[in-house]
């Protein structure tokens, strides 16, 4: 059953890479966020942004988020950071 679940997940979801660049010396990928393939680009970006912001808990504990940073903590995604969906990189500006 695990193979079927993995295949279904691959068909329905894609990973958005969240790249922190606003306050860093060099852009750094801090997370991969699972987003539904059928969502609009704006909805995928919104989901990646929300899921990498700490609200009630540390954002890296959110479901569908894969932590990619070293260490015990990482700031939330902010204006000036980027999200990569497919081959297109989007800058957080609102």
Functional labels for PLM-detected ranges:
Residues 1-41:
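N-terminal disorder-to-order initiation segments that are Gly/Lys/Arg-biased
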Residues 8, 18, 27, 44, ...:
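Alpha-helical structural elements
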Residues 16, 23-26, 35, 52, ...:
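Generic signature of intrinsically disordered, low-complexity segments enriched in small/polar residues
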Residues 60-73, 78:
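A conserved acidic, glycine/proline-rich C-terminal tail/linker
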Residues 73-94:
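Short, compact, well-ordered microdomains
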């Amino acid at each position: 059953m695990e193979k079927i679940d993995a295949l279904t997940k691959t068909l329905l979801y894609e990973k958005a890479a969240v790249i922190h660049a606003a306050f860093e010396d060099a852009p750094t990928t801090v997370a991969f966020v699972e987003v539904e393939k059928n969502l609009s680009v704006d909805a995928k970006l919104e989901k990646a942004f929300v899921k990498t912001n700490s609200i009630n808990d540390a954002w890296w504990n959110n479901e569908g988020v894969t932590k990619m940073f070293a260490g015990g903590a990482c700031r939330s995604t902010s204006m000036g950071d980027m999200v990569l969906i497919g081959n297109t990189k989007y800058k957080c500006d609102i």
